[in-house]
Curated annotation (Swiss-Prot):
<dbReference type="GO" id="GO:0008408">
    <property type="term" value="F:3'-5' exonuclease activity"/>
</dbReference>
<feature type="binding site">
    <location>
        <position position="181"/>
    </location>
    <ligand>
        <name>Mg(2+) 2</name>
    </ligand>
</feature>
<dbReference type="GO" id="GO:0045004">
    <property type="term" value="P:DNA replication proofreading"/>
</dbReference>
<comment type="similarity">
    <text>Belongs to the RNase T family.</text>
</comment>
<keyword id="KW-0378">Hydrolase</keyword>
<feature type="site" description="Important for substrate binding and specificity">
    <location>
        <position position="124"/>
    </location>
</feature>
<keyword id="KW-0460">Magnesium</keyword>
<feature type="site" description="Important for substrate binding and specificity">
    <location>
        <position position="29"/>
    </location>
</feature>
<comment type="function">
    <text>Trims short 3' overhangs of a variety of RNA species, leaving a one or two nucleotide 3' overhang. Responsible for the end-turnover of tRNA: specifically removes the terminal AMP residue from uncharged tRNA (tRNA-C-C-A). Also appears to be involved in tRNA biosynthesis.</text>
</comment>
<feature type="active site" description="Proton donor/acceptor">
    <location>
        <position position="181"/>
    </location>
</feature>
<feature type="binding site">
    <location>
        <position position="23"/>
    </location>
    <ligand>
        <name>Mg(2+) 1</name>
    </ligand>
</feature>
<dbReference type="GO" id="GO:0016896">
    <property type="term" value="F:RNA exonuclease activity, producing 5'-phosphomonoesters"/>
</dbReference>
<keyword id="KW-0819">tRNA processing</keyword>
<dbReference type="InterPro" id="IPR013520">
    <property type="entry name" value="Exonuclease_RNaseT/DNA_pol3"/>
</dbReference>
<feature type="binding site">
    <location>
        <position position="23"/>
    </location>
    <ligand>
        <name>Mg(2+) 2</name>
    </ligand>
</feature>
<dbReference type="GO" id="GO:0003676">
    <property type="term" value="F:nucleic acid binding"/>
</dbReference>
<dbReference type="Pfam" id="PF00929">
    <property type="entry name" value="RNase_T"/>
</dbReference>
Length: 217
């Protein structure tokens, strides 16, 4: 078995955290009152040389919880019709239960301690996941209660861009604005972007960390 703290294994790269890319589409900005309408999750994998790539994915359309607020402006922005039967929507419980199961399996297989949400403007997605978890009464939430990796902040640092589409294009990742604001597409692009930035930092010599003795020779 490889050393769990080795720099080129997933558990050693992010201090025991298992990064999972999440995107949500919603009926507004308030995680407590507004509907969670769509969610996608992509796990990440690391090869033997320490390069990060997207892994497994799950995607669900979600039924608004009872009494959920649906802001017309938010629905116009996402293009989601919550009442369309062709959405094949499931309950918040069903969607999160499946995602949590996938994530817990990844944590175990990669010898990590806990999952951490990777998202673009991550506080938004994190707040909706946490609120839905509380509403459904789901136990054993695998995600850290407040820590996240925000690709908007990382994109500003690495690429000089904070908008997802512009950050992707700057990084050489194709981005189709016609598919944007679909949770599945945005999660896929965010996963590619996060992997590109992590791998670029490694390529530039920023990882593995150099010890003081190695620096001074």
């Amino acid at each position: 078995m490889s050393d769990k703290k080795a720099p080129n294994v997933l558990s050693g790269r992010f201090r025991g955290y298992y990064p999972v890319v999440i995107d949500v589409e919603t009926g507004g900005f308030n995680a407590k009152t507004d509907a969670l309408l769509e969610i996608a999750a992509v796990t990440l994998e690391m090869d033997g040389e320490g390069w990060l790539t997207p892994g497994e994915s799950l995607h669900f359309h979600i039924e608004p919880f009872e009494g959920a607020n649906l802001e017309p402006a938010a629905l116009e922005f996402t293009g989601i019709d919550p009442l369309n039967p062709l959405r094949g929507a499931v309950s918040e419980y069903e969607a999160l239960h499946a995602i949590f199961k996938m994530v817990r399996k990844g944590i175990k297989n990669n010898h990590c301690n806990r999952a951490i949400i990777v998202a673009h403007n991550a506080n938004f997605d994190h707040s909706f996941v946490m609120a839905a978890t509380e509403r459904t009464g789901l136990k054993r939430n695998p995600f850290h209660p407040f820590a996240t990796f925000d690709t908007a902040a990382l994109g500003g640092l690495v690429l000089g861009q904070t908008i997802l589409a512009k950050a992707c294009i700057t990084a050489g990742i194709p981005f189709d604005n016609n598919q944007a604001h679909s949770a599945l597409y945005d999660t896929d692009r965010t996963a590619e972007l996060f992997c590109e930035m992590v791998n670029r930092w490694k390529q530039l010599g920023g990882w593995p960390l150099t010890t003081t003795a190695e620096k001074t020779g």
